[in-house]
């Protein structure tokens, strides 16, 4: 019987959530891509074909693939879920009471398939057939968005992350991604796969304003044996780490959290862009950023109510070794000379998805790093990524494990 549990980064991967890039990418243009957190526009059809190859590779490894669009359609079939999502996303404060009422009614009358496509892919004023007496639509240009597209939903890793016996519904840092979390909140509450199941919601499943307590799943590595490794990047804050750690400790789901202070720039927007877990004792690391002297803290529970001890750790590798009971980690650095390594890290060479110990999925374009992995005994299942890689995310970024074995 399948279960909702992720016990490691490297145990057998059994079930995963992906999101095929479609309508949202068609709304991505040179003039809006930076606001939507992309560096460039992607060839939509080619990106979809590359994503299909990624999903196919997972299925060939006996991994069950769930697709976000399908789950959202099936969730919207629950009337309470549909009403909640529209009330949450089409609020009076966001649109004004008159236009919000008119827009909600228009969306309520859509079939579930069409509504899911709009919620994920966006809607421009030029595509809106209804008239409203509100001022707001009269003041907008035709190509302005009524509902902003969510192209970053491609990166299902970030919006929610499963940690041992529960899930964190992450308060996202960037406004362009904050609506994503509500889709996962609805799915985990009402979709038949999750409704009534026994799992913990650690953090983020309420209607609070989280201020500076941001967490994104690309910074969260479930390294196993009760330990969690979290990067404090440009997207995850110390406040977010401590809130998540407190919830994990209170639930009895983690024995320690190792927090690493990362440089705050785009090339390492998340920990998993510079470091991933490939085998029980093996990590991929981009050494230009992941220096041994990065400020690191070890958080452990103090009592049973979520309080914690916080102590400095002077070497994150030693902290990981201690947590996993290993004498020494095996570190594989990004391949090629300094120029090639920088290029390949930028193209997600370190952002691989482990499907079982010593077997990972990564982009075929990163030839120097893939060769280095192979020589170190790591099998790389390569997938095309010339278009997907331009979104600044690799196989780990594009996947949210929902079921994975312990180590």
UniProtKB/Swiss-Prot annotation:
The active site is at residue 397. This is Arginine deiminase. It is found in: Cytoplasm. One of its GO terms (biological process) is arginine catabolic process to ornithine. Transmembrane segments: none annotated. The lineage of its organism: Bacteria, Pseudomonadati, Pseudomonadota, Gammaproteobacteria, Vibrionales. Pfam families: ADI. Pathway: Amino-acid degradation; L-arginine degradation via ADI pathway; carbamoyl phosphate from L-arginine: step 1/2. It comes from Vibrio parahaemolyticus serotype O3:K6 (strain RIMD 2210633). It catalyses: L-arginine + H2O = L-citrulline + NH4(+).
């Amino acid at each position: 019987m399948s279960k909702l549990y992720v016990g490691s980064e490297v145990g057998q991967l059994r079930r995963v959530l992906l999101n095929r890039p479609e309508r949202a990418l068609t709304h991505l243009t040179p003039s809006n891509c930076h606001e939507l957190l992309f560096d460039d526009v992607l060839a939509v059809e080619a990106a979809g074909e590359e994503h299909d190859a990624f999903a196919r590779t997972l299925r060939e490894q006996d991994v069950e693939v769930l697709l976000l669009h399908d789950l959202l359609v099936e969730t919207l079939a629950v009337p309470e879920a549909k009403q909640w999502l529209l009330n949450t996303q089409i609020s009076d404060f966001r649109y004004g009471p008159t236009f919000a009422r008119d827009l909600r009614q228009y969306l309520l009358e859509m079939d579930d398939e069409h509504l899911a496509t709009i919620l994920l892919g966006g809607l421009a004023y030029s595509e809106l057939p209804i008239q409203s007496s509100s001022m707001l639509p009269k003041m907008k240009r035709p190509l302005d968005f009524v509902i902003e597209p969510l192209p970053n939903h491609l990166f299902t890793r970030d919006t929610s992350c499963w940690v041992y016996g529960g899930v964190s519904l992450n308060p996202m840092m960037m406004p362009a991604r904050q609506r994503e979390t509500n889709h996962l909140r609805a799915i985990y509450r009402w979709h038949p796969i999750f409704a009534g199941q026994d799992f913990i919601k650690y953090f983020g499943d309420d209607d609070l304003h989280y201020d500076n307590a941001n967490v994104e799943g690309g910074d969260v590595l479930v390294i196993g044996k009760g330990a969690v490794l979290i990067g404090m990047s440009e997207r995850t804050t110390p406040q977010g780490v401590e809130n998540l750690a407190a919830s994990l400790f209170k639930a009895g789901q983690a024995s320690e959290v190792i927090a690493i202070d990362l440089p705050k720039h785009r090339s390492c927007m998340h920990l998993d862009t510079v470091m991933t877990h490939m085998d029980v004792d093996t990590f991929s690391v981009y050494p230009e950023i992941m220096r041994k002297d990065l400020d690191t803290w070890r958080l452990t529970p103090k009592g049973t109510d979520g309080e914690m001890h916080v102590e400095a750790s002077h070497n994150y590798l030693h902290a990981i070794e201690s947590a996993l009971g290993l004498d020494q980690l095996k570190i594989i650095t990004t391949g090629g000379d300094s120029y090639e390594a920088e290029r390949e890290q930028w193209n997600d060479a370190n952002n691989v998805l482990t499907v079982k110990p010593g077997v990972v999925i990564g982009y075929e374009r990163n030839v120097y790093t893939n060769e280095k992995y192979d020589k170190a005994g790591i099998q790389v299942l390569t997938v095309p990524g010339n278009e997907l890689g331009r979104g600044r995310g690799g196989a780990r970024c594009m996947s949210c494990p929902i079921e994975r074995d312990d180590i």
